[in-house]
């Protein structure tokens, strides 16, 4: 960082949550020229979406007033609809389970919002993510947050060198409990606010009900792997591989619980199997699409590393075979359960996040 903090303008994306509130406070304490910006990504007048954005913006206003920084709201509803929500619906239509957070970071926070921040004269864009950036051997590296339980590099895996060169993660070195304490000690309005969970535009509402407003549900049969009809499903898009709850089959006296093992989109059949250790729930590898490495240095065609296939999962040993057209074949050291097409596979070397891909196919 060549300029002194007081001459360095940092735009911080504020959500109204405690993480971004403390991030803003720390930047201000470190002497940066800080501006808080609240992103509005969903149209609240659209009754189908649930949004707490009016309350959240009020929290941003209160925190920014407390710490003495200017604040604005910026509207990215159109960009969000075009680049994230349309993708979200298309993935569900294709029978997959998308991860809108990964796409939102790639296309909105660190693209549309970053562009906006730079137009405002910002040197950096900061967020409340639990992650860290460092500069080593002429490249930026994305590192896990110190609080391993909160680390959010899984959702940031698609960020490139330019995006990381402009990113600041002021709370990445903190444990969550210490972050809360900082907020309480400073008397921040958001100090005791609970963390948001779930997909931002659905909020606390029923997921099935939300999705049915946008995509027509096509009920069909639930069939076991040995061909027996077990019941009816409400529409394949409502089910995820490995899912156990909400199938409406089984119950007391029917033996082990049932799990979703496959979806046949053409025939509109949901396949299930009984028992959580059934071999059909496991796979030995996957094909990844849209592979993006954080580093721009040439990669070997075969890489031994660890990977996560879902957020907060312990790292698993893998071998990545880099193939043409931004695809890769990932073979697991140990068979993995319930790998889900549409989700992210994210690669690590110790604390360094190497990048990631979208799970495209499962290799049984």
UniProtKB/Swiss-Prot annotation:
GO terms under cellular component: cytoplasm
Entry function: Catalyzes the 2-thiolation of uridine at the wobble position (U34) of tRNA, leading to the formation of s(2)U34.
PANTHER family linked to this entry: MITOCHONDRIAL TRNA-SPECIFIC 2-THIOURIDYLASE 1 (PTHR11933:SF5), TRNA 5-METHYLAMINOMETHYL-2-THIOURIDYLATE -METHYLTRANSFERASE (PTHR11933)
Binding site for ATP: 13-20, 39, 128
Protein name: tRNA-specific 2-thiouridylase MnmA
InterPro entries: MnmA-like (IPR004506), MnmA-like_C (IPR046885), MnmA-like_central (IPR046884), MnmA-like_central_sf (IPR023382), Rossmann-like_a/b/a_fold (IPR014729)
Entry keyword annotation includes tRNA processing: yes
Residue pairs linked by disulfide bridges in the UniProt entry: 104-200
UniProt lineage: Bacteria, Bacillati, Bacillota, Clostridia, Peptostreptococcales
Reaction it catalyzes: S-sulfanyl-L-cysteinyl-[protein] + uridine(34) in tRNA + AH2 + ATP = 2-thiouridine(34) in tRNA + L-cysteinyl-[protein] + A + AMP + diphosphate + H(+)
GO annotation terms (biological process): tRNA wobble position uridine thiolation
Domain of life: Bacteria
Region feature Interaction with tRNA, mapped onto this chain: 150-152, 310-311
Enzyme nomenclature, EC number: 2.8.1.13
Main location (coarse class): cytoplasm
Active-site positions on this chain: 104 (nucleophile), 200 (cysteine persulfide intermediate)
Record-stated family: Belongs to the MnmA/TRMU family.
Annotated positions for site Interaction with tRNA: 129, 343
NCBIfam families to which the protein is assigned, alphabetical: PRK00143.1, trmU
Record localization: Cytoplasm
Key words of the record: ATP-binding, Cytoplasm, Disulfide bond, Nucleotide-binding, RNA-binding, Transferase, tRNA processing, tRNA-binding
GO MF entries: ATP binding; tRNA binding; tRNA-uridine 2-sulfurtransferase activity
Record region (Interaction with target base in tRNA): 99-101
